[in-house]
């Protein structure tokens, strides 16, 4: 069997050895997968594998095992490759069967006339780092790694080091030549530059033109590698926008970037479909390997959450962790509520609703109705820099977030909805292509007077659909395709938001700091890292807890609602009942309670009454203004 390090440093050697021993047995491929899955189940073995998210590409050894924490941004058409091919040994002149799985190119000449060639099928996913991942989460993932890497010296680059922008410019200025930008070989050894940085201009440009190479990140200014992931098994188990931690064999062979007439026919046969692609498709589907490395998947772990402070679920470690943390849920909740109250200028009611919003989660769907969503509109927010600082504080609490400044220019120019580019045969990303449980902060205080153009109207409509139905309708030109999502949306506004929401809470500051920036900075700096980590664990854990309502409490709630309707038939509606049930659920989970009690229901009614009273009071004040 392979040594303890071979499966990480030389996984292809493991694969080829198993192929040589068992190629007559059709189950050899399953044995390979079982071997690697078995290795990755060993305690702490996941942390031994270097991560593309943390380690610059030039530090990683080609053909080694790496992992990549990512979102599936696009899924390309299936492709054919040479699963088994025959080569002629140049020294002995004997024919040798080779395995083509988990490879992009052949090592030596292929016998093109061999009857032993086996053509197989695989699919390519275009994967990007999880959009909006918070700096604290990235840092925590990096610190937990036990992988030891040194700069790779496997091969020397055959060109001068160049930036992403230069590669991008080359592709812009030579759009007519088939794969012309790739004629200079790229090696991972040329990456003395920062391999993991992409220019924000690639994502902020509102133009639909995709003739230039970009990394197609959903959010502007994002950094990190993009990968072409080759998938061999379990294709039906993956969906667009899945968040995964992929373990696979890294391929950055310079031959991948030698295109057009210079490409070796034998390597082309590893993917014969390439010869049928248009130049635009080739540019999108076969970017330089030094910019977009290939990753041949051996194992993929779905990420139920993206919080590095929590153990992976479901495991024994996770169950034990949850049990121990539940004991202190109530005390951590009290500390977090006090912190948020200070952040919201002394408004305890708004702080409680913000806490409930942060743990909300779409736990199921009934027909088209997403259950569990809790979009909060925090109105009456101070202008200037308050909302920006509020977002920065929320960003420190959640693993993934994004602030959309709803200025007129942004709404008219930014692409929120992903769109299919039929020329390049790829999905052009949009800012609403986000991972599940991302906190989306919509800053409506930035909206000024002016005219929304057709693009702006479409963007506002897309935001409304996201809030109301937790779905985004992707633009496929001839039709729209609906993609469900699970995004926590917080809207900050001066008055009532122009967007729908599940709950509006007018902010009532109890303090008026002379220097808002200094006030909020002082509050944040007063929190120790250990305390912030408790808050982060609390928010992620609360949304994963199971929840139920007993028949007894259900009957009590129904009777109570009937009495409320009798007392005030005009004001109390079925919508109010639904909102109070959502609030009651979130209140229970925020306490670490997985069932609704009578006290929990009464508490939900009480804070909803306070909120409605405040909202009515605010309406009266606004109507009396000249």
UniProtKB/Swiss-Prot annotation:
GO molecular function list: chromatin binding
Keywords: Cell cycle, Cell division, DNA replication, Mitosis, Nucleus
Residue stretches of biased makeup (Basic and acidic residues): 177-196
UniProt entry tagged with the keyword Cell cycle: yes
Gene Ontology BP, a term: DNA-templated DNA replication
Functional description taken from the UniProt entry: Associated component of the mcm complex that acts as a regulator of DNA replication. Binds to the MCM complex during late S phase and promotes the disassembly of the mcm complex from chromatin, thereby acting as a key regulator of pre-replication complex (pre-RC) unloading from replicated DNA. Can dissociate the mcm complex without addition of ATP; probably acts by destabilizing interactions of each individual subunits of the mcm complex. Required for sister chromatid cohesion.
Summary of subunit composition and partner proteins: Interacts with the mcm complex: associates with the mcm3-7 complex which lacks mcm2, while it does not interact with the mcm complex when mcm2 is present (mcm2-7 complex).
Protein name (Swiss-Prot/TrEMBL): Mini-chromosome maintenance complex-binding protein
Organism encoding this protein: Salmo salar
Encoding gene per record: mcmbp
């Amino acid at each position: 069997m392979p040594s303890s390090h071979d499966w990480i440093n030389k996984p292809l050697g493991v694969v080829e050895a198993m192929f040589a021993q068992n190629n007559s047995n059709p189950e050899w491929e399953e044995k390979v997968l079982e071997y690697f899955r078995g290795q990755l189940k060993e305690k702490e073995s996941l942390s031994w594998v270097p991560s593309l998210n943390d380690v610059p590409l030039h530090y990683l050894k080609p053909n080694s095992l790496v992992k990549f924490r990512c979102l599936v941004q696009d899924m390309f058409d299936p492709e054919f490759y040479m699963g088994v091919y025959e080569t002629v040994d140049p020294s002995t002149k004997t024919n040798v069967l080779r395995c083509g799985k988990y490879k992009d190119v052949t090592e030596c000449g292929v016998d093109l006339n061999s009857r032993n060639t086996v053509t197989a099928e695989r699919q390519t996913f275009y994967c990007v780092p999880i959009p909006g991942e918070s700096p604290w989460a990235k840092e925590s993932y990096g610190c937990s790694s036990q992988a030891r890497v040194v700069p790779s010296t496997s091969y020397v680059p055959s060109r001068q080091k160049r930036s992403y922008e230069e590669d991008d410019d080359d592709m812009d200025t030579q759009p007519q030549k088939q794969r012309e930008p790739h004629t200079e070989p790229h090696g991972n050894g040329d990456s003395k530059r920062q391999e993991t940085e992409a220019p924000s201009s690639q994502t902020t440009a509102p133009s639909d033109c995709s003739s230039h190479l970009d990394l197609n990140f959903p959010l502007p200014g994002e950094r990190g590698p993009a990968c072409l992931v080759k998938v061999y098994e379990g294709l039906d188990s993956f969906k667009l926008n899945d968040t995964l931690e992929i373990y696979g064999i890294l391929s950055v062979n310079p031959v991948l970037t030698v295109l057009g007439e210079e490409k070796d026919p034998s390597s082309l046969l590893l993917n014969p479909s390439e010869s049928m692609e248009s130049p635009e498709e080739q540019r999108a589907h076969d970017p330089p390997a030094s910019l977009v490395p290939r990753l041949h998947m051996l194992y993929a772990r779905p990420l139920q959450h993206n919080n590095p402070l929590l153990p992976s679920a479901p495991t024994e470690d996770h169950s034990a962790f949850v049990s121990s943390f539940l004991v202190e849920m109530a005390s951590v909740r009290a500390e977090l509520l006090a912190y948020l109250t200070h952040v919201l200028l002394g408004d305890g009611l708004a702080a409680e609703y913000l806490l409930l919003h942060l743990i909300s989660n779409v736990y199921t769907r009934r027909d088209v109705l997403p259950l569990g969503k809790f979009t909060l509109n925090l109105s009456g927010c101070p202008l200037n820099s308050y909302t920006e600082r509020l977002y920065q504080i929320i960003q420190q609490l959640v693993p993934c977030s994004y602030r959309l400044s709803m200025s007129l220019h942004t709404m008219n120019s930014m692409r929120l909805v992903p769109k299919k580019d039929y020329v390049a045969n790829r999905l052009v990303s949009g800012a609403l292509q986000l991972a599940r449980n991302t906190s989306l902060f919509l800053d409506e205080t930035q909206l000024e007077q002016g005219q929304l153009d057709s693009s702006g109207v479409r963007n506002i409509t897309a935001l409304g659909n996201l809030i109301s139905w937790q779905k985004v309708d992707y633009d496929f030109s001839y039709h729209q395709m609906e993609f469900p999502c699970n995004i926590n949306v917080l809207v900050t506004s001066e008055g009532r938001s122009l967007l729908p929401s599940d709950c509006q809470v007018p902010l009532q500051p109890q303090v008026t700091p002379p220097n808002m920036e200094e006030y909020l900075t002082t509050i944040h700096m007063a929190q120790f890292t250990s305390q912030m980590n408790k808050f982060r664990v609390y928010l992620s854990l609360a949304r994963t807890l199971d929840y139920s309502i007993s028949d007894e409490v259900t009957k009590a709630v129904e009777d109570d609602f009937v009495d409320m309707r009798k007392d005030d038939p005009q004001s109390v509606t079925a919508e109010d009942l639904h909102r109070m049930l959502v609030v009651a659920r979130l209140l229970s989970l925020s306490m670490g309670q997985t069932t609704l009690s009578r006290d929990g229901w009464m508490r939900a009614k009480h804070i909803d009454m306070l909120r409605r009273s405040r909202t009515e009071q605010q309406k009266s004040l606004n109507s009396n203004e000249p």
